[in-house]
Structures are given as structure tokens and as C-alpha cells.
Design a protein with these regions (language model features):
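Structured alpha/beta or helical-core interaction and ligand-binding surfaces enriched in interleaved
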Residues: 1-146
Length: 146
């Protein structure tokens, strides 16, 4: 009997994320330019965008996905902006691929990323200018470009 090689079973975070989206359906695609949109349009301090100075800024601490969902659903105008069209996503560490998803996938995809991929998550809409940062340190921020 040969010993198992644990590395041969390894899949990258990108592969895991894309497989998850494939299981949801076909209303998504890999999307270049998500990180560039964020870098061009937001001011950064260190590795994170400064959102506190922007319109409609809201923040909350979270311990799990349910806390994030409660934060968003308790702010109907925020939730409405997020769910009003296609949503772009990029992580800042383990995932290299940006993706664009249908809004109907948002909560399932958010839950998957929070529970499975340890990185800061950026959801945004280049078309309408909103951004949602879900930080690994346990806080979430939402803001809209002026």
C-alpha cells in the first residue's frame, strides 16, 4: 500500500471558488478589472480602502455569515443597491480571479467565501459605484462613490 500524497488532493482557492459558482448555475463569469476598479476609485491606507469618507457609509462587526446578512437586511437601501444588478468580487490574498455574479447568487456566494476562504473580500458594482468590504478581522463596511 502506498502512502497518500496530501498535495495531490490540494485544490487552490480559485478552483474551489469557481467550482462553487459552477454548482450554483451559469449566471457568473471570470472578470478582469475588478481590482483595478477598486484601486482607481478608492483611497487606500495600507492595504484597505478608506470607506468612512464616502456617501452612505455603514459598518458593523460580525462573527459569522448570519451577522453579515442581518447587517445588510437591516439596511434596506444598502441591500437594494447590492441586489440591483451584477456584482463584482475580488479577494485580496488567496483568490486571484475576479468574478462577476448575478445578484441572486450573492448571499450563497458570500456565505461560501466567509466560511471557506480566509481573506478580505470586496464586492462592488463598477456601474453604480458601491463597495462592500468584508474584512477577516470581523467587520463589514459599505459605501458608495460620490
Amino acid at each position: 500500500m502506498s502512502p497518500k500524497n496530501p498535495v495531490s488532493n490540494f485544490i487552490s482557492a480559485d478552483e474551489e471558488m469557481l467550482a462553487f459558482l459552477s454548482n450554483l448555475g451559469q449566471k457568473w463569469c471570470v472578470s478582469d478589472g475588478v481590482a483595478e476598479f477598486i484601486e482607481r476609485n478608492f483611497t487606500f491606507v495600507g492595504s484597505k480602502p478608506v470607506l468612512q469618507i464616502l456617501k452612505d457609509y455603514k459598518t458593523s462587526d460580525y462573527k459569522n455569515f448570519a451577522d453579515i446578512k442581518n447587517f445588510l437586511s437591516s439596511n434596506p437601501s444598502t441591500q437594494s443597491k447590492i441586489l440591483s444588478g451584477e456584482i463584482s468580487y475580488v479577494g485580496d490574498n488567496l483568490t486571484g480571479a475576479g468574478v462577476k455574479i448575478a445578484s441572486e447568487y450573492f448571499y450563497d456566494f458570500l456565505k461560501f467565501t466567509v466560511e471557506n476562504i480566509p481573506e478580505h473580500r470586496y464586492f462592488c458594482s463598477p456601474e453604480t459605484g458601491w463597495i462592500l468590504l468584508v474584512a477577516m478581522e470581523g467587520y463589514v463596511e459599505f459605501a458608495v462613490l460620490d
